[in-house]
Amino acid sequence: MRTGVRLAVDPGAARIGVARSDPDGILAIPVETIRRGPGDLDRIAALVLEYEAREVIVGYPASLSGAEGRAARAARAFAKALARRLAPVPVRLVDERLTTVTAELHLRTGASYRKRGARGGRARRSVIDQAAATVLLQNALDTERRTKLPPGELVEGTP
C-alpha cells in the first residue's frame, strides 16, 4: 500500500467536509468544514500544503442505480476545478454513497455529538460534514489496502 497523507473532501451545496489520513495511510481523521464559495479551493490547497498530501479524494455521490445525477455532475465539476487548482497533486473521485448516513448513525451514539447538537443545527451539520469526509476517506484507504489499487477514478487532467 502507498504511504503518505491523503486529504478527502466531501463537497455539498453549502459546506465541504474535510478529513486527512495519517502519514501511513491507515487511519482517517476529521479536519474541518469549509463554507462553499469564494476561497474554498484556496483553503483546500492550503490544507494540501499544510499536510503535504500526496493525493486528494473527492466524494462522488453516484445514485444507487449508478446513474450520474445532478449532485454527481456537480461533484465531478468541483473535482475538475480542484484538480486544476492543485496540479500536480492527483485528485480522485470516489463513490460516497451513504457516507453521510453512515457518519450520522455513528455520531448519534456519541456523547460529544449530542453535546454539539445541543448548540444548534449549524454546529451539528459541520460535525456531520467532517464525519462524512472521514468515512469517505477510511473507505478509500481500506479499499486500497484490500485491492492494492488506488481507489476510485483519477480526475481528468491530473498526473
From Swiss-Prot:
Compartments where located: Cytoplasm
Alphabetical keyword list: Cytoplasm, Hydrolase, Nuclease, Ribosome biogenesis
The EC number(s) this enzyme carries: 3.1.-.-
Keyword Hydrolase: yes
Main EC class the enzyme belongs to: hydrolase
S-S bonds: none
SUPFAM superfamilies named among the record's database cross-references: Ribonuclease H-like
InterPro entries: RNaseH-like_sf, YqgF, YqgF/RNaseH-like_dom, YqgF/RNaseH-like_dom_sf
Keyword Hydrolase applies: yes
GO CC annotation: cytosol
Molecular-function GO term, any one: nuclease activity
Any Pfam family: RuvX
A Gene Ontology biological process term: rRNA 5'-end processing
Superkingdom assignment: Bacteria
Entry function: Could be a nuclease involved in processing of the 5'-end of pre-16S rRNA.
Classification via PANTHER family: POLYNUCLEOTIDYL TRANSFERASE, RIBONUCLEASE H-LIKE SUPERFAMILY PROTEIN (PTHR33317:SF4)
Family classification: Belongs to the YqgF nuclease family.
Stated name of the protein: Putative pre-16S rRNA nuclease
Species annotation: Thermobifida fusca (strain YX)
Organism ancestry: Bacteria, Bacillati, Actinomycetota, Actinomycetes, Streptosporangiales
